[in-house]
Amino acid sequence: MGTNQILDEIREVNLSYLLLAQQMLREDRIAAMYRLGIDEDIADILVKLTNSQLLKMAGSNMLLCRFRFDDSLIAEILTSHKQDRALTQSHAAILMAGLPAEKIS
Protein backbone atom coordinates (compact mmCIF):
# COMPACT_ATOMS: atom_id res chain seq x y z
CA MET A 1 0.00 0.00 0.00
CA GLY A 2 1.58 3.27 -1.10
CA THR A 3 1.62 6.59 0.71
CA ASN A 4 -1.08 8.11 -1.51
CA GLN A 5 -3.38 5.17 -0.93
CA ILE A 6 -2.86 5.41 2.84
CA LEU A 7 -3.65 9.14 2.75
CA ASP A 8 -6.82 8.42 0.74
CA GLU A 9 -7.86 5.80 3.31
CA ILE A 10 -7.20 8.23 6.18
CA ARG A 11 -9.29 10.89 4.42
CA GLU A 12 -12.16 8.42 3.99
CA VAL A 13 -12.03 7.31 7.63
CA ASN A 14 -11.87 10.92 8.81
CA LEU A 15 -14.84 11.99 6.70
CA SER A 16 -16.92 9.00 7.82
CA TYR A 17 -16.01 9.68 11.45
CA LEU A 18 -16.88 13.39 11.23
CA LEU A 19 -20.20 12.73 9.50
CA LEU A 20 -21.11 10.05 12.03
CA ALA A 21 -20.12 12.32 14.92
CA GLN A 22 -22.31 15.14 13.58
CA GLN A 23 -25.27 12.81 13.10
CA MET A 24 -24.88 11.35 16.59
CA LEU A 25 -24.60 14.80 18.17
CA ARG A 26 -27.73 16.04 16.39
CA GLU A 27 -29.76 12.99 17.42
CA ASP A 28 -28.70 12.67 21.08
CA ARG A 29 -26.01 15.11 22.16
CA ILE A 30 -25.35 13.70 25.64
CA ALA A 31 -25.11 10.08 24.50
CA ALA A 32 -22.94 11.11 21.54
CA MET A 33 -20.54 13.05 23.75
CA TYR A 34 -20.21 10.00 25.97
CA ARG A 35 -19.72 7.57 23.08
CA LEU A 36 -17.27 9.83 21.26
CA GLY A 37 -15.38 10.74 24.43
CA ILE A 38 -15.59 14.47 23.74
CA ASP A 39 -16.51 17.49 25.84
CA GLU A 40 -19.05 20.22 25.07
CA ASP A 41 -16.53 22.52 23.40
CA ILE A 42 -15.58 19.92 20.82
CA ALA A 43 -19.23 18.88 20.38
CA ASP A 44 -20.14 22.51 19.61
CA ILE A 45 -17.35 22.77 17.04
CA LEU A 46 -18.28 19.51 15.32
CA VAL A 47 -21.98 20.35 15.04
CA LYS A 48 -21.26 23.76 13.49
CA LEU A 49 -18.85 22.52 10.80
CA THR A 50 -19.91 23.23 7.22
CA ASN A 51 -19.44 20.66 4.46
CA SER A 52 -16.41 22.57 3.24
CA GLN A 53 -14.88 22.56 6.72
CA LEU A 54 -15.62 18.84 7.10
CA LEU A 55 -13.79 18.09 3.86
CA LYS A 56 -10.86 20.26 4.88
CA MET A 57 -10.56 18.53 8.26
CA ALA A 58 -10.98 15.08 6.71
CA GLY A 59 -8.10 15.84 4.34
CA SER A 60 -5.64 15.93 7.22
CA ASN A 61 -2.77 13.46 6.97
CA MET A 62 -3.53 12.13 10.46
CA LEU A 63 -6.47 10.19 11.84
CA LEU A 64 -8.94 12.37 13.71
CA CYS A 65 -10.32 9.47 15.72
CA ARG A 66 -8.25 7.42 18.10
CA PHE A 67 -8.53 4.59 20.58
CA ARG A 68 -10.07 5.88 23.79
CA PHE A 69 -8.15 3.52 25.99
CA ASP A 70 -4.52 3.13 26.85
CA ASP A 71 -5.26 0.46 29.39
CA SER A 72 -4.66 -3.11 28.26
CA LEU A 73 -7.42 -4.27 30.64
CA ILE A 74 -10.06 -2.43 28.60
CA ALA A 75 -8.69 -3.85 25.34
CA GLU A 76 -8.74 -7.31 26.87
CA ILE A 77 -12.32 -6.91 28.09
CA LEU A 78 -13.53 -5.66 24.70
CA THR A 79 -11.92 -8.56 22.84
CA SER A 80 -12.76 -11.38 25.24
CA HIS A 81 -15.06 -14.12 24.03
CA LYS A 82 -16.95 -14.66 27.26
CA GLN A 83 -20.53 -15.84 26.99
CA ASP A 84 -22.12 -12.79 28.63
CA ARG A 85 -21.20 -10.19 26.01
CA ALA A 86 -23.60 -7.57 27.42
CA LEU A 87 -21.94 -7.77 30.83
CA THR A 88 -18.48 -7.54 29.28
CA GLN A 89 -19.45 -4.47 27.24
CA SER A 90 -21.05 -2.86 30.28
CA HIS A 91 -17.87 -3.42 32.29
CA ALA A 92 -15.76 -1.81 29.55
CA ALA A 93 -18.21 1.11 29.28
CA ILE A 94 -17.99 1.72 33.03
CA LEU A 95 -14.19 1.74 32.90
CA MET A 96 -14.14 4.04 29.88
CA ALA A 97 -16.71 6.39 31.43
CA GLY A 98 -14.14 7.14 34.11
CA LEU A 99 -11.71 8.46 31.50
CA PRO A 100 -11.72 12.24 30.97
CA ALA A 101 -13.22 13.73 27.82
CA GLU A 102 -10.74 15.11 25.32
CA LYS A 103 -9.93 18.80 25.47
CA ILE A 104 -8.60 21.06 22.76
CA SER A 105 -5.14 22.15 23.82
From Swiss-Prot:
The keyword Cell membrane does not apply. One of its GO terms (cellular component) is cytoplasm. InterPro entries: Flagellar_FlhD, FlhD_sf. Keywords: Activator, Bacterial flagellum biogenesis, Cytoplasm, Disulfide bond, DNA-binding, Transcription, Transcription regulation. It comes from the Bacteria. GO terms for biological process: bacterial-type flagellum assembly; positive regulation of DNA-templated transcription; regulation of bacterial-type flagellum assembly. Its main location: cytoplasm. Functions in complex with FlhC as a master transcriptional regulator that regulates transcription of several flagellar and non-flagellar operons by binding to their promoter region. Activates expression of class 2 flagellar genes, including fliA, which is a flagellum-specific sigma factor that turns on the class 3 genes. Also regulates genes whose products function in a variety of physiological pathways. Homodimer; disulfide-linked. Forms a heterohexamer composed of two FlhC and four FlhD subunits. Each FlhC binds a FlhD dimer, forming a heterotrimer, and a hexamer assembles by dimerization of two heterotrimers. The C-terminal region contains a putative helix-turn-helix (HTH) motif, suggesting that this region may bind DNA. Belongs to the FlhD family. This is Flagellar transcriptional regulator FlhD. It comes from Nitrosomonas europaea (strain ATCC 19718 / CIP 103999 / KCTC 2705 / NBRC 14298). The lineage of its organism: Bacteria, Pseudomonadati, Pseudomonadota, Betaproteobacteria, Nitrosomonadales. The gene is flhD.
